[in-house]
């Protein structure tokens, strides 16, 4: 079970975008995340008439490692660690380590 999932609101802990918040839009590989509005880079693209694309400078979201982000806890307004709790019926749920409350979401 992944502790950070698609749709989670996260806060960046390290790097150029430290302190910024965004929503996870996609998981790349196993430990890299694409976060909306975070880690934007400018790429120079050549025109390709076969694909119908024009050339120029485009902004692209690049993946960021999951160790550099933490799930944002709206109740405390801070980044929080995530734990896995096994319920009595055997299902596993994600909980915030600081408060023990269940993480709602996807």
Curated annotation (Swiss-Prot):
- What is a single Pfam family found in this protein's UniProt entry? KOW
InterPro entries of this UniProt entry?
KOW, Rib_uL2_dom2, Ribosomal_uL24, Ribosomal_uL24_CS, Ribosomal_uL24_KOW, Translation_prot_SH3-like_sf
Fill in the subunit field for this protein.
Part of the 50S ribosomal subunit.
**Does this entry carry the keyword Transmembrane?**
no
- Which keywords, in A-to-Z order, does the entry hold? Ribonucleoprotein, Ribosomal protein, RNA-binding, rRNA-binding
SMART domains attached here? KOW
Summarize the protein's role. One of two assembly initiator proteins, it binds directly to the 5'-end of the 23S rRNA, where it nucleates assembly of the 50S subunit. One of the proteins that surrounds the polypeptide exit tunnel on the outside of the subunit.
Which GO terms fall under biological process for this protein? translation
- List, alphabetically, the GO terms of the cellular component aspect: ribonucleoprotein complex; ribosome
Q: Which PANTHER family match?
A: MITOCHONDRIAL RIBOSOMAL PROTEIN L24
| Similarity comment: family membership | Belongs to the universal ribosomal protein uL24 family.
Give a GO molecular function annotation for the protein.
rRNA binding
Q: Which domain of life is it from?
A: Bacteria
Kindly provide the name given to this protein in its UniProt entry. Large ribosomal subunit protein uL24
């Amino acid at each position: 079970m992944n502790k950070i999932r698609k749709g989670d609101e996260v806060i960046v802990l390290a790097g150029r975008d430290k302190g910024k918040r965004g929503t996870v839009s996609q998981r790349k590989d196993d430990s890299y995340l694409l976060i909306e509005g975070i880690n934007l880079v400018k790429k120079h693209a050549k025109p390709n008439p076969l694909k119908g694309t024009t050339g120029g400078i485009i902004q692209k979201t690049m993946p960021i490692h999951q160790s550099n982000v933490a799930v944002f806890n709206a109740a405390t307004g801070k980044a929080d660690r995530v734990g896995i709790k096994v319920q009595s019926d055997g299902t596993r749920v994600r909980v915030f380590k600081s408060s023990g409350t269940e993480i709602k979401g996807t």
